[in-house]
């Protein structure tokens, strides 16, 4: 089974404040395949983290196709312990703004075969962090936030 690693990061200056996300898609050997940076408007750190995961799910589904994703192991790596533990089902969602984002991810996951979320140290997520900070610095609108109406654009 092929394995894809998706590094995601979201950040906010002000929390809530101007927010950005970074997504890096790599093969199982760690070779980068694609990277994305996007400005998210005004969000909290956790909302930005969730938006990055949503974008990653939507993008990998588009890149691989609906059939191939069922036979591909997808490992998300993020440096937000809270978000990774919530997505793995270990922590409750107590913030009502995060619940719809969690549900969106839950529904997107249904199309995938094996998918899991792993918390990693910030040092191992430098590239996604750099992309998120770049988006916040530039107010970059290279992509739109992941949304049901039309999906992401690059």
Name each model feature, range by range.
Residues 1, 153-154:
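Short, low-complexity, intrinsically disordered N-terminal peptides in bacterial proteins
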Residues 29, 151-153:
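Charged/polar low-complexity intrinsically disordered segments
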């Amino acid at each position: 089974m092929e394995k894809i690693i998706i590094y995601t990061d979201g950040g906010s200056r002000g929390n809530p404040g101007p927010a950005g996300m970074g997504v890096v898609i790599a093969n199982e050997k760690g070779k980068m395949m694609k990277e994305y940076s996007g400005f998210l408007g005004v969000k909290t750190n956790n909302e930005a983290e969730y938006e990055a995961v949503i974008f990653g799910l939507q993008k990998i589904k588009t890149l691989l196709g609906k059939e191939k994703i069922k036979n591909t192991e997808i490992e998300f790596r993020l440096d937000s312990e809270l978000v990774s533990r919530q997505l793995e089902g270990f922590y409750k969602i107590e913030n009502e703004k995060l619940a719809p984002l969690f549900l969106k991810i839950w529904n997107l996951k249904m199309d995938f075969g094996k998918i899991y979320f792993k918390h990693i140290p910030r040092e191992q997520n430098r590239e996604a962090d750099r992309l998120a900070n770049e988006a916040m610095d530039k107010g970059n609108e290279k992509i739109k936030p992941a949304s049901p109406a039309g999906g992401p654009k690059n």
